[in-house]
C-alpha cells in the first residue's frame, strides 16, 4: 500500500509558500499573525 505523504518541494511551495500566502487576503492575515508572534520562519 502506498503511503499518503509523498513529499514534493514544488507542491509544498505552491501551496504553503510566501507567494501563495501573499496571493489571498486570508494568507496575508496568516503572515501578519506569524510576524506578530515573532516566528523565525513565516512560510516553508
UniProtKB/Swiss-Prot annotation:
The keyword Ribosomal protein applies. One of its GO terms (molecular function) is structural constituent of ribosome. The keyword Methyltransferase does not apply. Residues 1-44 are annotated as: Disordered. It comes from the Bacteria. Keywords: Ribonucleoprotein, Ribosomal protein. GO terms for biological process: translation. One of its GO terms (cellular component) is ribonucleoprotein complex. Pfam families: Ribosomal_L34. Residues 30-44 have a biased composition (Basic residues). InterPro entries: Ribosomal_bL34, Ribosomal_bL34_CS. Signal peptide: none annotated. Belongs to the bacterial ribosomal protein bL34 family. This is Large ribosomal subunit protein bL34.
Amino acid at each position: 500500500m502506498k503511503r499518503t505523504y509523498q513529499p514534493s518541494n514544488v507542491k509544498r511551495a505552491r501551496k504553503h509558500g510566501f507567494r501563495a500566502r501573499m496571493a489571498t487576503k486570508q494568507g496575508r492575515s496568516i503572515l501578519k499573525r506569524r510576524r506578530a508572534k515573532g516566528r523565525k520562519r513565516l512560510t516553508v
